[in-house]
Amino acid sequence: MEIVRTIAEADCAARALPRPLGLVPTMGALHDGHLALVARARATCASVMATIFVNPLQFGPNEDFAKYPRAFPEDARRLEAAGVDLLFAPSVAEMYPTGFDTTVDPGAVGTRYEGALRPGHFRGVATVCAKLFAIAGAERA
């Protein structure tokens, strides 16, 4: 499994993989549900790319981004054992450089369900997913 940290590296590595490419975005702290998604991608795609990125945009002001569990070495080992070909694990600065201000507005759903209790949560999720999908260029997710 190749591990990359920059958008340029991820773009280059993903383009080189056999198609179709399946993308499994995560924030790490992997559980069996994540691994089931990897297994599904492995069964239906020629290549699998996973991401580990704890996205600060989906945490509200009273939520503790800093305390979100991070176990990169163990998560990477589990993803490799599950058959992931490429792991993209960028820094916050890589995903949201100084001056970044483009976000995805999820519309009304952003204020319903979990969004009613966590303002901005769905905007953060939609933004990071759009960025990860664009970087990966995957056919399936």
Label each PLM-derived region with a short phrase.
Residues 1-141:
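Nucleotidyltransferase catalytic core that binds NTPs
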